[in-house]
Amino acid sequence: MESKEELRQRIGDLAFEVTQHAATERAFTGQYDDFFEKGIYVDVVSGEVLFSSLDKFNSGCGWPAFSRPIHHRMVTNHHDSSHGMRRVEVKSREAGSHLGHVFNDGPREAGGLRYCINSAALKFIPYDQMEQEGYAEWLGIFDKS
């Protein structure tokens, strides 16, 4: 089992603070905010599949935004009343990594949700590398688009 210090060294300080202590990266600074390549986004801690580029949109909020997770069972929602706000925190199911928050102001035609996710909590797997990275079972989602 990986220690917290080993995890910090593997994923970096910012990703560690975001995923393990629910920190938030500054708006418009994350590598995936204005990034729209074809592929999937996985938890930087565990590698579990979270989101697809098919559901990513430009919300203008400064963080990557998705209309839904790749499958509803991949994330969990939690009440968050930190910083004097009432929000819904989003975590990865397996690792319990803090990812960001979900809001009810997303594209209406896509279900109305906006998953506002920290880039530091994610690792992008390009479509053409999914098979070699061990994510071949998810290639089929792109056939439906």
Swiss-Prot record:
Q: Which GO terms describe its cellular component?
A: cytoplasm
Q: Which InterPro entries match?
A: Met_Sox_Rdtase_MsrB, Met_Sox_Rdtase_MsrB_dom, Mss4-like_sf
Catalytic residues identified in the record:
C116 (nucleophile)
Q: What class of enzyme is it?
A: oxidoreductase
Q: Locate the MsrB domain: which residues?
A: 4-127
Which Gene3D superfamilies does UniProt cross-reference here?
Peptide methionine sulfoxide reductase (2.170.150.20)
Does the record carry Oxidoreductase as a key word? yes
Q: Which Pfam families match?
A: SelR
Q: Which reaction does it catalyse?
A: L-methionyl-[protein] + [thioredoxin]-disulfide + H2O = L-methionyl-(R)-S-oxide-[protein] + [thioredoxin]-dithiol
Per the UniProt entry, the Enzyme Commission number(s) are: 1.8.4.12
Gene Ontology BP terms: protein repair; response to oxidative stress
Q: Name one GO molecular function term.
A: peptide-methionine (R)-S-oxide reductase activity
UniProt keywords, alphabetically: Oxidoreductase
Q: Which PANTHER family match?
A: METHIONINE SULFOXIDE REDUCTASE (PTHR10173), PEPTIDE METHIONINE SULFOXIDE REDUCTASE MSRA_MSRB (PTHR10173:SF59)
UniProt record similarity statement = Belongs to the MsrB Met sulfoxide reductase family.
- What is this protein identified as? Peptide methionine sulfoxide reductase MsrB
- Source species: Streptococcus equi subsp. zooepidemicus (strain H70)
